[in-house]
């Protein structure tokens, strides 16, 4: 056997036995604000695989470190997404030959706010919805001007309103 084949086989065995520490970011905002471009440029185009055909999502995957679920609108079954966003060794389903998942970063990119994904599952399978939320490390919200703000899932769903204080005159104080 050639050294390349031997190292490839060893690599495949290694990948099937190693937990991948995953970072998952949910990105949403209006169209044309640079959501996808920001990820591809930030991570490097050659490091990214973008799912756009949700009937055969992984046929073109070649071991890239970054997975983009682009134009996502609850496009894959929730139980499948839970597997794709977890770090356990995973074979990705493909038409001709399954592929080993090697990515450690995943981005779900959409025009929809996070709470508009999997709406029926939020009520019918709340434990699965909660499992999805636990896998998401960051919610990135893009504005029309292309600027964005990052939140944890908790911060996103429970925005903290910082109290404001007013200066009052001593005569207005009841104490």
PLM regions and their residue ranges:
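Single conserved hydrophobic/aromatic residue that forms the stacking wall/gate
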Residues: 2-10, 14
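AAA+/P-loop NTPase substrate/partner-engagement loops
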Residues: 46-77
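A generic structural signal for secondary-structure junctions
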Residues: 10, 43-44, 86
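Short loop/turn elements that form and flank the Walker-type P-loop nucleotide-binding site
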Residues: 7, 21, 62-63, 101-103
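Glycine-rich phosphate-binding P-loop
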Residues: 23-44
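Generic beta-sheet signal
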Residues: 23-27, 65-69, 106-108
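Phosphate-binding P-loop
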Residues: 15-22
């Amino acid at each position: 056997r050639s050294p390349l084949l031997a190292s490839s086989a060893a690599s495949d065995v290694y990948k099937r036995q190693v937990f991948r520490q995953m970072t998952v970011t949910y990105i949403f905002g209006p169209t044309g604000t640079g959501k996808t471009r920001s990820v591809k440029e930030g991570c490097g185009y050659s490091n990214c695989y973008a799912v756009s055909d949700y009937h055969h999502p992984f046929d073109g995957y070649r071991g890239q470190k970054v997975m983009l679920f682009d134009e996502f609108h609850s496009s894959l079954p929730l139980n499948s997404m839970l597997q794709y966003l977890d770090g356990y060794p995973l074979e990705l389903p493909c038409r001709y030959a399954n592929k080993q998942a090697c990515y450690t970063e995943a981005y779900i990119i959409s025009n929809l706010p996070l709470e508009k994904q999997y709406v029926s599952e939020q009520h019918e399978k709340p434990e699965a919805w909660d499992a999805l939320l636990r896998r998401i490390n960051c919610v990135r919200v893009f504005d029309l001007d292309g600027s964005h703000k990052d939140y944890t899932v908790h911060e996103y769903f429970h925005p903290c309103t910082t109290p404001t204080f007013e200066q009052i005159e001593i005569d207005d104080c009841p104490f």
